[in-house]
Amino acid sequence: MRALVQRVSRASVSVGGELIAAIGPGVLVLLGVAPGDTAGVADRLADRVRALRIFEDGDGRMNEALGARQALCVSQFTLYADTSRGNRPGFSGSAPAEAAEPLYERFCERLGAERGAFGARMAVELVNDGPVTILVDAQSA
């Protein structure tokens, strides 16, 4: 499981022109699920994302975790793209939707995140703050 975590001042997700989720200051998490990922992996990664100290404290140093700030999570199987052969990426490194969706939902629930629409074509808008963008792999969580 991989989480691309972006510190944002705001973010939103729309499907078919309809707004389905929006947050103010917090994190936008693009989440990819791999074959073999488990509920335990989802829980550990969500806890790790929540604990990342990527917000500024009173002294302007990145020293605070998510806390009461908001989170928005979007499923992103393309985080497991394989570009080693030619110019067309392969996605066999990502879990099939029927295995990935319950783990995505579990991760979002544990993180307390608003959600995009799993498997849908979405328009994601964000204002990156910093910018701060961090890739967290479950193997290191």
What are these regions (language model features)?
Residues R7-V15, A21, G36:
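N-terminal intrinsically disordered, cationic/polar leader segments
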Residues L19-A68, A81-E109, E114:
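Compact, glycine-rich, soluble single-domain proteins
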Residues V124-D137:
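C-terminal edge-of-domain segments
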Residues L45, V74, V132:
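Residue-level signal for inorganic ion chemistry
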Residues A22, L135-A141:
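Compositionally biased, non-globular sequence tracts
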Residues F77:
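Glycine/small-residue-rich phosphate/adenosyl-binding loop
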